[in-house]
Amino acid sequence: MATAQEKHLRNVHQLTFGGQNAEAYFSADGKKLIFQSSHGDVKCDQIFIMNIDGSDQHMVSTGKGRTTCSFFYPDGKRILYASTHLASPECPPKPDYSKGYVWGVYSGYDIFTASPDGSNLKQLTDTPGYDAEATISVDGKKITFTS
């Protein structure tokens, strides 16, 4: 956490323990976080939501394939993320890290939206290749993504 010499960060708290946890983003009301995690029985990154204090962590993605790049829509009524679960329910192989950090550009990624509890899953992209890294406009009417 923050060291005694740290001048810019205060009230720093660890919210996740164990596994690999990444890419956490706030809901517009500041009450929740959405993030990707692999831990315990979850061997491949999945999308989770938790309260801002770290309580009530729960998976909202399908539990299949690999997921990444999740966000809340501004109105809080939907979430957005990329997943490989339709290409294969299995976890894709990890990239070769022997030459340093690399991002797994899996051709099976497509972009999905869902309710914050994971229900009402809707596929937004269905093209061959990598569709991920989506972000949402401030008004929630547009998304942009890498393809």
PLM features: residue spans?
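Hydrophobic beta-strand positions that form the internal "hydrophobic ladder"
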Residues: 30-34, 79, 143
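A short beta-strand motif characteristic of beta-propeller blades
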Residues: 12-15, 56-61, 120-125
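Solenoidal tandem-repeat scaffolds enriched in leucines and small polar residues
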Residues: 117-147
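Short loop/turn segments that connect beta-strands within beta-propeller blades
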Residues: 51-55, 115-119
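Residue-level detector of Asp-centered blade-edge/turn motifs that repeat once per structural unit
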Residues: 28-29, 74-75, 138-139
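Blade/loop signatures of beta-propeller domains
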Residues: 1-10, 109
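A flexible loop/linker signature enriched in serine peptidases of the S9 family
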Residues: 20, 37-47, 61-67, 82-110, ...
